[in-house]
């Protein structure tokens, strides 16, 4: 398989993003930019599609994936409860490079392949225009780890990763070099006085 390449660096072409979004709905993989690093995305509600991510990256299946959303309605569909402290974090940092750990819905709308069987799920709303448009047009949350073969550096531009991932994903969306160049900060609100906040792209 030869990946379909879209160059959106200078101008976002909505028809091309729509084609890639349709690919997501069909269970295909899309390499796309965020403000942090590039990601390999699949429909987060489709177990078979998610499994393709692990194959493409050579990633262990016990390593959970971050779910990317474009609006709060998507979040409410997949998590059990949004507490007051999470709402404050969302209002302050979303869209942006913050992943928040939530309890996932007991109905397991998000499959175990995304969460590695955990009862929690990491979710973020990217600020990158292309990423948000891709998610919105696909109409589903997108599970997406960093775009690289496991053990290799995360990709901050397509040129760094195209050789190792071309043919492993159906679509490659080139949005130029990412702004931040680090993975998102991951946080879990344990209580109002205790936040788990590692040093990363927010600080």
Language-model features: where?
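Active-site-adjacent structural elements in enzyme catalytic cores
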Residues: 1-195
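Single conserved hydrophobic/aromatic residue that forms the stacking wall/gate
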Residues: 194, 199-203
């Amino acid at each position: 398989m030869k990946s379909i390449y879209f160059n959106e660096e200078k101008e976002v072409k909505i028809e091309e993003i729509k084609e890639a979004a349709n690919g997501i709905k069909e269970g295909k993989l899309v390499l796309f930019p965020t403000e942090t690093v590039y990601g390999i995305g699949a429909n987060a509600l489709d177990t078979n599609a998610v499994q393709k991510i692990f194959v493409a990256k050579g990633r262990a299946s016990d390593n959970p994936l971050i779910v990317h959303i474009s609006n709060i309605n998507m979040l409410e569909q997949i998590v059990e409860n949004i507490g007051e402290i999470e709402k404050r974090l969302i209002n302050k940092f979303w869209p942006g490079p913050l992943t928040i750990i939530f309890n996932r819905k007991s109905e397991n709308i998000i499959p175990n392949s995304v969460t590695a069987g955990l009862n929690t799920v990491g979710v973020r709303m990217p600020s990158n225009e292309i990423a948000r448009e891709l998610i919105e047009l696909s109409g589903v949350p997108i599970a997406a780890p960093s775009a690289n073969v496991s053990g290799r550096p995360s990709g901050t531009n397509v040129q760094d990763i195209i050789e190792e991932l071309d043919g492993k994903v159906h679509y490659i969306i080139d949005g130029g070099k990412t702004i931040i160049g680090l993975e998102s900060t991951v946080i879990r609100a344990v209580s109002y006085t205790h936040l788990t906040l590692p040093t990363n792209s927010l600080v």
